[in-house]
Amino acid sequence: HDMMLALSVSGKTPWVWGAMRHAWSLGSTVALITEDAQSEAAQLASMVIAPELGADVVAGYTNAKAGIAQSMILHMITTGLAVRSGRVYSNLRVDLEASNTRWAERQIAIVMEAGGCSRAQAKAALESCNHQCKTAVLMVLTGLDAWKAHELLAQN
């Protein structure tokens, strides 16, 4: 069930065509984000996202508007995938690893907001479940211990 998402403003980039052809030869679905829905790359794709943007304000700046549009579309796609795959609770990203101090603080804030608990309770929940944010949120919301919360999440 793999899918390739290609990006090409013009739809004329040869190495993008090559990657698309390779993915297609492996049986993958191929989608494309491009400004030119009639390009060769668009003809190779199973799905084409081609926003109609109009001309850039100042010509010659390497399709700045198209690049920004592609970035916005990618953010929408990844946000949708995060929600669909269970990485989001309410509007909070709960599948967050604490790889540094900033992310550890973000985990605490998420558990506090999702669970309506104090900082001390959030830290204690995170410490008891090896800093698995989603597990800590479930613990605070339900009163389950770390093991039971982890098992319940694994089942769903």
Task: Indicate residue ranges for each PLM-predicted region.
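Glycine-rich phosphate-binding loops that contact phosphosugars or nucleotide phosphates
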Residues: 1-85
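Short, amphipathic alpha-helical interaction segments embedded in low-complexity terminal/linker regions
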Residues: 81-156
